[in-house]
């Protein structure tokens, strides 16, 4: 059976492309990294090694998932989708090739000798992965339906152009991201107070904009201490906006902003940016307390997630109860108190109004 679906005929604006691609990338990270980590947390609690490896498999599929996400959000057919999957995997710089033979074992215990040059998948980095996947989709969608040779021409052109783009970008972006990660780590050592405050505030801002805080944390491969600061900063937004507006919204809306994403408050912040002050202040205050006083740190895979789907707290609870306790105290309780107090101050000063955080279905 051949693929007959064509690319959409309506013209998309740059804003549409940014929104659609960002949404797809965020969902890819949520499923591959977030659910992958969640499965590993369950596996650790259940002492089930095979399930833990399933979580690992989910995480290393992040590169190809970017391509599928972009193609899906831009309404591509399957020929273009698979081309984007290949291109984004190349762009992620996620596949290594062994220099000698080795024995491999699957999650089910099947063993097989792997010859030299066997591929080894890793998570990779999202910058050039997303770019390569997007290029493949744009090329594929443009060519779809223009010739009688779609079955051959579309995937060949999309894969070739996307993969070459991925190779070129990965050669530049991977070293650059490694350098940026080292720079952030060094700045944290030079001035842990200002460093943790800056990282926490930056990732809190990323979370509340259309950008993906989780993708950016993965992109720069934050060091453990910076990741801890970023996690506190993003968690403060989940907690802060929920406690400030829980009386203004119904249960569903509070669940949406409390454990899915506070990004739903973005339209309200455009109306009155001062609403963001309490959670942002909480992020700046709590991050150095966590990282300096309690030596809180975590992996970059959790850094930008906040309370999304409760992945971070469940992962911390299953791996280190001490860090989980610090996270709950400094990342949840303290930001809630700070945000609520400052919100009442803003109300008293008439800087904000009582119903400006109400979420509406549009």
Residue ranges with predicted function:
Residues 2-362:
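Pore-lining transmembrane helices
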């Amino acid at each position: 059976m051949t693929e007959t679906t064509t690319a959409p005929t309506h013209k998309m604006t740059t804003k549409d492309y940014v929104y659609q691609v960002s949404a797809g990338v965020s969902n890819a990270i949520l499923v591959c990294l977030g659910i992958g980590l969640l499965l590993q947390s369950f596996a650790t609690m259940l002492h089930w090694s095979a399930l833990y490896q399933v979580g690992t498999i989910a995480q290393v599929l992040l590169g190809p998932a970017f391509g599928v996400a972009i193609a899906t959000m831009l309404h591509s057919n399957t020929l273009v989708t698979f081309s984007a999957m290949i291109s984004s995997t190349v762009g992620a710089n996620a596949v290594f090739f062994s220099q000698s033979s080795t024995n491999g074992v699957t999650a089910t215990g099947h063993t097989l000798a792997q010859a030299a040059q066997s591929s080894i998948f890793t998570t990779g980095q999202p910058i050039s992965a997303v770019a390569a996947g997007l290029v493949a989709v744009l090329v594929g969608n443009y060519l779809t339906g223009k010739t009688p040779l779609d079955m051959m021409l579309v995937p060949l052109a999309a894969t070739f152009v996307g993969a070459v783009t991925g190779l070129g970008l990965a050669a530049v972006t991977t070293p650059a991201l490694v350098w940026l990660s080292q720079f952030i780590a060094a700045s944290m050592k030079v001035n842990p107070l200002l460093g943790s405050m800056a990282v926490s505030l930056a990732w809190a801002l990323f979370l509340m904009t259309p950008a993906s805080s989780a993708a950016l944390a993965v992109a720069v491969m934050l060091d453990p201490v910076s990741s801890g600061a970023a996690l506190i900063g993003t968690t403060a937004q989940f907690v802060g906006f929920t406690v400030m507006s829980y009386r203004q919204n119904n249960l569903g809306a509070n669940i949406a902003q409390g454990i899915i994403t506070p990004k739903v408050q973005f339209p309200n912040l455009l109306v009155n940016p001062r609403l963001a002050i309490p959670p942002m202040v909480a992020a700046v205050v709590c991050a150095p307390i966590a990282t300096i006083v309690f030596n809180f740190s975590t992996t970059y895979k959790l850094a930008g997630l906040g309370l999304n789907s409760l992945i971070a707290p469940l992962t911390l609870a299953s791996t280190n109860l001490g860090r989980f306790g610090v996270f709950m105290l400094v990342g949840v309780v303290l930001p809630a108190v700070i945000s609520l107090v400052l919100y009442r101050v803003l109300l008293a000063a008439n800087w904000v109004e009582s119903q400006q955080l109400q979420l509406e279905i549009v």
